[in-house]
């Protein structure tokens, strides 16, 4: 069916909720977007243009999906809620730019954390071309999804993600700030981070207790050479194990011998009294590489 009122509006969302007896499921972190300006802001931040291949995570009732399609995107969406396929089939436009919906939209009923992108998208996307990822992420699973996408084989030009504002601030945090930590470092060694817009809690139905923000992550032309990434991430996490402790104290797990710790920090010209949030990303890379050398 064709509707003039956008799905991303309180009136249309309420009508869908009543028609299908659907509700936002807390266990899936669902909150329906009912602010068209916010949704269109996400689409603009993602730079969606006609012909773009878009992977969406968690389409819900289609608030964002509809606007991605209207902007010209070809959308493959991952969803786990079995109550939503009927709603999406009925409520998204039957035709988009003269094409039937099934030519522009594919619903993949699978947890994105278990996605096999090459198989899932074959036959729908041209896999020789990159995609753009756009998502309104459930708060409780934001970080695992980000890491899953970064570590996947999916060829993407950008990740445009709405998430809890606090997590967005952690992604973009710089040394010296309270938000700076392992997540900031893990992401910033691979991606540029742009806080595109903030979305207040009143933009959702039901309203969450916290505000959200939209972040655009773009792969760096030259990602930082961190060596073994799992080892690097482990070193960083252990360095931040106790934020109020000094760097020397936090390194005890990795280097139990005090002389080893003192030598490593002296060789790297790092003050053992510093706290981890005072170190630049390059310092953590040097620490990780030095520990790897010591363990050979």
Swiss-Prot record:
This protein's GO CC annotations: cytosol
Reactions that this protein is recorded to catalyse: adenosine(1518)/adenosine(1519) in 16S rRNA + 4 S-adenosyl-L-methionine = N(6)-dimethyladenosine(1518)/N(6)-dimethyladenosine(1519) in 16S rRNA + 4 S-adenosyl-L-homocysteine + 4 H(+)
InterPro entries: KsgA/Erm, rRNA_Ade_diMease-like_C, rRNA_Ade_Mease_Trfase_CS, rRNA_Ade_methylase_Trfase_N, rRNA_adenine_dimethylase, SAM-dependent_MTases_sf
Annotated positions binding S-adenosyl-L-methionine: 31, 33, 58, 79, 111, 136
Subcellular location(s) per record: Cytoplasm
EC annotation from Swiss-Prot or TrEMBL: 2.1.1.182
Keyword annotations: Cytoplasm, Methyltransferase, RNA-binding, rRNA processing, S-adenosyl-L-methionine, Transferase
Keyword RNA-binding recorded: yes
Primary localization class, coarse: cytoplasm
Record has Methyltransferase as a keyword: yes
Enzyme class, spelled out: transferase
Top-level taxonomic group: Bacteria
Gene Ontology molecular functions: 16S rRNA (adenine(1518)-N(6)/adenine(1519)-N(6))-dimethyltransferase activity; RNA binding
Sequence similarity: Belongs to the class I-like SAM-binding methyltransferase superfamily. rRNA adenine N(6)-methyltransferase family. RsmA subfamily.
PANTHER family given in the database record: DIMETHYLADENOSINE TRANSFERASE, DIMETHYLADENOSINE TRANSFERASE-RELATED
Role played: Specifically dimethylates two adjacent adenosines (A1518 and A1519) in the loop of a conserved hairpin near the 3'-end of 16S rRNA in the 30S particle. May play a critical role in biogenesis of 30S subunits.
UniProt name for this protein: Ribosomal RNA small subunit methyltransferase A
Gene: rsmA
């Amino acid at each position: 069916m064709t509707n003039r009122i956008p799905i991303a509006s309180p009136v249309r969302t309420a009508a869908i909720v009543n028609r299908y007896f659907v509700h936002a499921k807390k266990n899936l972190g669902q909150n329906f977007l009912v602010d068209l300006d916010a949704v269109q802001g996400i689409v603009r931040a993602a730079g969606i243009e006609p012909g773009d291949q878009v992977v969406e995570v968690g389409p819900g009732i289609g608030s964002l999906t509809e606007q991605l399609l209207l902007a010209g995107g070809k959308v493959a969406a991952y969803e786990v809620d079995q109550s939503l396929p009927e709603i999406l089939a009925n409520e998204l436009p039957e035709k988009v730019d003269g094409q039937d919906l099934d030519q522009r939209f594919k619903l993949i009923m699978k947890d994105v954390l278990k996605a096999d992108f090459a198989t899932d998208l074959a036959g729908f996307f041209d896999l020789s071309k990159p995609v753009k990822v756009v998502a309104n992420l459930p708060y409780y699973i934001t970080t695992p999804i980000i890491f899953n996408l970064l570590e996947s084989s999916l060829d993407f030009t950008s990740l445009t993600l709405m998430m809890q504002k606090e997590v967005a601030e952690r992604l973009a945090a710089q040394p010296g700030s309270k938000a700076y930590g392992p997540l900031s470092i893990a992401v910033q060694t691979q991606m540029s981070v742009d806080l595109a817009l903030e979305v207040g809690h009143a933009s959702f139905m039901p309203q969450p207790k916290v505000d959200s923000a939209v972040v655009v992550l773009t792969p760096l032309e030259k990602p930082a050479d961190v060596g073994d990434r799992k080892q690097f991430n482990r070193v960083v996490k252990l360095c931040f194990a106790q934020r109020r402790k000094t760097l020397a104290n936090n390194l005890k797990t990795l280097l139990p011998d005090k002389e080893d710790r003192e030598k490593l920090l002296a060789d790297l010209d790092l003050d053992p009294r510093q706290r981890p949030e005072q170190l630049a990303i390059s310092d953590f890379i040097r620490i990780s590489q030095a520990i790897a050398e010591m363990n050979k």
